[in-house]
């Protein structure tokens, strides 16, 4: 088996694994970009780990990079199986037990801390804006930054599951140098 075929197989397997975990277990994701860390995200992350361990919860706890709402850091997302991913902002360590007790264990969103939710999946939450309704995000069409806030920047598995290295594999095995140059020119990369 070639390295490219192995990469494709690994990507498919990781996407399936992440999809199953995302559907079957609650997920808590903390924004751990430099802005989040400076605002206290590392302490919030540790408080989540401690609370999950103390309660013996079967929850996926992860991190992601900056999504772009630095003024609301630390950010914490909760997604229950079959539900929307809800973002909480300006989260303090003292808020962690309340978010876990209310949202993770009882499915009740903590409205005073909720800042937005991801509208993919056809969800609508009354009184909480979706990301595409927020002024900062509504006119954005993320291309190069499409994975920001969605993958763990320290996880090679997350990167591969999101299609990382696929373009490199294609360039090295399927395209001529002239085709690569034409592709880059046609892409119209900007920003």
Enumerate the language-model features and the residues they cover.
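Feature of Fe-S/electron-transfer and energy-metabolism proteins
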Residues: 1-191
């Amino acid at each position: 088996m070639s390295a490219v075929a192995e990469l494709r197989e690994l990507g498919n397997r990781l996407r399936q694994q992440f999809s199953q975990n995302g559907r079957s277990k609650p997920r808590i994701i903390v924004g751990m970009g430099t802005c989040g860390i400076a605002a206290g995200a590392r302490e919030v992350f540790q408080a989540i780990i401690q609370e999950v361990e103390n309660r013996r919860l079967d929850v996926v706890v992860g991190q992601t990079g900056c999504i772009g709402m630095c003024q609301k850091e630390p950010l914490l997302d909760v997604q229950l199986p079959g539900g929307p991913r809800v973002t909480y902002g300006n989260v303090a360590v003292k808020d962690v037990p309340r978010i876990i007790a209310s949202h993770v264990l009882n499915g009740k969103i903590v409205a005073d801390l909720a800042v937005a939710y991801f509208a993919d999946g056809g969800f609508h939450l009354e009184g909480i804006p979706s990301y595409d309704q927020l002024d900062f995000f509504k006119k954005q069409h993320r291309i190069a930054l499409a994975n920001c806030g969605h993958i763990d920047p320290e996880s090679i598995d997350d990167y591969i599951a999101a299609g990382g290295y696929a373009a490199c594999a294609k360039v090295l095995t399927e395209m001529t140098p002239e085709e690569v140059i034409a592709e880059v020119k046609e892409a119209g990369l900007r920003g």
